[in-house]
Design a protein with these regions (language model features):
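Absolute protein N-terminus
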Residues: 1-3, 128
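Short alpha-helical elements of helix-turn-helix
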Residues: 4-8, 56-60
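DNA-binding recognition helix and immediately preceding turn/loop
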Residues: 5-49, 68-83
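A solvent-exposed interaction/effector surface
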Residues: 40-44, 48, 60, 64-67, ...
Length: 287
């Protein structure tokens, strides 16, 4: 459970520095993880982004102060990171469905979010099916887009990219280069790391290839890794989302493995059929 304890250490760090302008890279460091992998894991375990958790917790504590102290509303707004009373009031109403003034007068029920403690329930009734494989470095060819992790932009925009490439013929072009070991279309997520743009990822739609060039497409080298390949079966995107959650909430905490921090992949069959028995895979590099 060491992996889970690292996540909790990062959460405790956020709580201890809740009134500060937190650097997500520093938070992730508490979990021994990159910014991307920490934020991804946090969202899968809690169904809430890191920024949303911080916002909820700060507004919860602000509501408590409004109810229990005589501090001025403007001072409380500044204390919890809002530059103007108007911005504070707007955010406060969105969460608590009342204004700060109404909260001070005890009107209505506030939406209070408690400090988070990660607990994992090991269900096991429907275990994830997986296989461990060793694979040397290989090349993929495809197109990439850059996405921010802030406010879940990547979660909203990546499905739009898939719709785009499925409708404009890009997938058909890519499949002509698919002559490597992995048969199918890949969704490859590359953490840019702290030395590049903080809070950004490169997302590739690609195929494995042995060819050096691909015309309009770019190439990316995937490092040699030990991979855990998880089976995903069922209609998209529900089956994929459910499996990701199971991996991080049930499999990783007891597996003895850690994420290697290199690119991870989803593998989809070329025909793209959307049926109840649709088969796809999740490839995660581990150490």
């Amino acid at each position: 459970m060491a992996w889970l304890q690292f996540i909790q250490t990062a959460i405790d760090y956020m709580e201890e520095h809740l009134l500060e302008d937190l650097d997500i890279e520093e938070v992730a460091k508490q979990a021994g993880s990159s910014s991307y992998h920490f934020q991804r894991t946090f969202a899968l375990l809690t169904d809430c982004s890191v920024s949303e958790y911080l916002r909820r917790r700060r507004l919860s504590l602000a509501a408590k102060e409004l109810s229990e102290t005589n501090e001025r509303i403007i001072d409380i707004a500044y204390k919890y990171g809002y530059d103007t009373p108007e911005a504070f009031s707007k955010a406060f109403r969105r969460q608590h469905d009342m204004t700060p003034t109404e909260a001070r007068k005890f009107r209505g029920r506030q939406q209070f979010f408690e400090r988070l403690v990660i607990q994992v329930t090991l269900k096991g009734a429907e275990p994830v099916k997986f296989n461990v494989v060793e694979k040397g470095k290989f090349n993929v060819i495809g197109m990439k887009r850059n996405y921010s992790l802030e406010n879940g932009e990547n979660l909203l925009e990546i499905p739009k990219l898939w719709n785009e490439v499925n409708s404009n013929g890009t997938i058909d072009k890519l499949c002509r280069f698919n002559n490597g070991h992995i048969k199918g279309v890949l969704g490859v997520c590359v953490d840019q790391g702290p030395d590049l743009q903080e809070g950004k990822i490169d997302y590739w739609i690609a195929v494995e290839t042995t060819d050096g060039r691909g015309g309009e497409f770019q190439t990316l080298e995937i490092p040699a890794s030990k991979w855990v390949v998880f089976e995903v079966k069922g209609p998209m995107p529900e089956a994929m989302q459910t499996t990701w959650k199971k991996i991080f909430s049930e499999w990783f905490p007891t597996s003895g493995y850690e994420h290697a921090g290199t690119p991870e992949m989803e593998v989809y069959p070329e025909d793209g059929s959307d049926t109840s028995e649709f088969y796809s895979e999740i490839w995660i590099p581990v150490k």
